[in-house]
Amino acid sequence: MGRTIENKQKIVTEIKSLLDDSEMAVVLDYKGLTIKEMSDLRSRLQTNNGICKVTKNSLMRKAIDGNSNWTDLESLLTGTNAFVLIKEDVGGAVKAIQSFQKETKKSETKGALFEGRLLSESEIKEIASLPSREVLMAKIAGALNGVATKIAISINEVPSGIARSLKQHSEKSES
């Protein structure tokens, strides 16, 4: 028994909603993966605000139709595809995909779309090498704290410098 038109429309609506919330889409060839392996991939992605969706290419085509951010995904819609839609931690999710692929040696990345642009395999790897959002925020906070500390030291140094100069001047005057 095939899917009804209402069921297909519901799936397309769900995919559109997921795409609206996503920053990046990674297309994987999932041929040869077991249900257990797909579940493992999904659980890894869940911790990084990613979702793995397996759907027909024709339904994905309908979901991206008219959405300029995702139209380039069309070129990847051949064969057996799993669509990884990533909301926030793009680097963490791509790392999760790559570690999964390294362990299973069954799945292959067909391509990815980020900010309306198709990414090459090397660009996808570069994204995975980026530090997580938390690490970047900690580095920025540390840098800002360092600047604030230097400013405070500089501000305190001005009166101290004036005081030292006056003291030296008064000592010279006394001698």
Curated annotation (Swiss-Prot):
Keywords from the UniProt entry: Ribonucleoprotein, Ribosomal protein, RNA-binding, rRNA-binding
Cellular component annotations (GO), alphabetically ordered: ribonucleoprotein complex; ribosome
Task performed by this protein: Forms part of the ribosomal stalk, playing a central role in the interaction of the ribosome with GTP-bound translation factors.
Matching InterPro entries: Ribosomal_uL10, Ribosomal_uL10-like_sf, Ribosomal_uL10_bac, Ribosomal_uL10_bac_type
Gene Ontology MF terms in the entry: large ribosomal subunit rRNA binding
Family: Belongs to the universal ribosomal protein uL10 family.
SUPFAM superfamilies on file: Ribosomal protein L10-like (SSF160369)
Pfam families: Ribosomal_L10 (PF00466)
Protein's GO biological process: translation
Quaternary state and interactors: Part of the ribosomal stalk of the 50S ribosomal subunit. The N-terminus interacts with L11 and the large rRNA to form the base of the stalk. The C-terminus forms an elongated spine to which L12 dimers bind in a sequential fashion forming a multimeric L10(L12)X complex.
Designated name of the protein: Large ribosomal subunit protein uL10
NCBIfam families referenced in this protein's UniProt entry, alphabetically: PRK00099.1-1
Superkingdom of the organism of origin: Bacteria
Gene assigned in the entry: rplJ
Membrane-spanning ranges: none
